[in-house]
Amino acid sequence: MTTLLMLYPAYGTVSCHEVCRHAEQIDGLRVVLADDSPTTSDLDIFDEVWELPPPENVKDAYALLRRWCEKRPADGLFLQSERGILLGSLMVRDLDLKGPSVEAAHLCSNKYLQRVALQKAGIGVPMFSLAEDEADVHRLAAQFGFPVLLKCVISTMSRLVTLISADDQVDASVARMREALKKSLDVKRLVSFSETGDVDLGCDPTRQFLVESFLKGDMIETDGFVVGDKPFTFGVTEQIQSIDPPFFIESYLLPSECTDNEAIETVSDATIRAMGLSDSAFSTEMRTLDGQTSIVEVNGRLGWDEGFSELFKVRTKQERILQAQQLALGYEMRLERDHSRCAALAYRSCYYNGIVEEIPTAAELNGLRTETLQLGLATHRGARFLAPPDPEVYPHVAWALATHPTSSHAANEIARTALERLQIMISRI
């Protein structure tokens, strides 16, 4: 029987159970969960459950996985979470399995070395440099021009990203960043990966951080799979981001109607090659202005925003989580792009400290569904929302996916209207 090991698979509202459910479509498959917080219900869903240390403890988790896999070898590793890709790449190397190499996983996680590699390949990136104190940021801001961004070296899912618009904001912003780095589990995970795999990080993420110029232009991304070393892109997706607070996604529009999408996909393919990524999913965020495209970041995994599977299925007609499992096992994948419908995935969000008091029931949401509209929740009654700049902020409350025969922007209007009609109450605290 073929064994698929799922490593820290859950993210946000995507549960371990949902990821496992798709694997049930693969005949003769034994599914093993390796996670830091397995539940009793996991024992009923998975064929076997291994309890790992938290993801930031790569050293001990790696040692446990090595011992377990020596006794019960895996035929594939599902490495589609930020928490799992670094550790998983070490296991891919040791077990000679399909998946991202250690070097590629590192470049997709270490945003400093990622920018170095992209710049070397002639691909556009923001102006960037490492900093570790207020003096560095004042100097770099004078060089780059305001606004500038402060970012943790490792990908943090939009956490620890600070926009600085003026010189008098620098000192307080740097102080917050330095304090946050001391507590960051993402930083601990990167350092533990470096020590375990003998990987040179090119910097000290416990005290250094990125300072970047702020990229202007249309906000877009590409998502897809790298099969072997060949990228397959679902399409070019336009992002609509929040303004105050900035950087949170309000809508995804597929396809983008504001860009030369063929040229964008050419840049995306070159970016994947520069990362050396293979046999994995990818998500690449970009800015394009006056025909010039620059990379904001590259991730060597699936994007996990609520509704993403439904959004991309409009174009590919396939379930991407199942495809990622097939890819990990080296199975043939069905790859296609259907251009007959445009789509938009919109979110209703909460940007203040609050407690969810009232949300629609599943039956109420199902009653609103139509052939061209789907809705879902990203939270539950009693859940607490945090206000930015709290590093644990996650603002999505509900999502809506709408399709339209000719326009993703028209689909977005339909989705946003549906979201505003939902009866949701979040009390401020």
Q: Model-derived features: where do they sit?
A:
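ATP-dependent carboxylate/phosphate-activation module, predominantly the ATP-grasp catalytic core
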Residues: D168, V174-M177, S213-L277, A281, ...
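Short, well-ordered beta-strand elements within core beta-sheets of diverse protein domains
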Residues: T162, E212-S213, S256, H396-P405
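Glycine-/Pro-rich loop/turn segments that contact NAD(P) or position catalytic residues
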Residues: H106-G124, D133
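Peripheral (often C-terminal) accessory segments that flank ATP-dependent C-N-forming ligase machineries
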Residues: L5, K120, Q325-I429
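A short beta-strand motif that forms the metal-chelation/ATP-contact edge
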Residues: S89, Q292-L302
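Short beta-strand-to-turn element immediately C-terminal to the catalytic PLP-Schiff-base lysine
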Residues: A131, V161-A166, F225-V227
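Conserved ATP-binding module of the ATP-grasp superfamily
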Residues: G124-P126, P147-L150, D167-K216, P245-F247, ...
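ATP-binding N-terminal substructure of ATP-dependent carboxylate-amine bond-forming enzymes
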Residues: M1-A104, A135, F385-L386, E392, ...
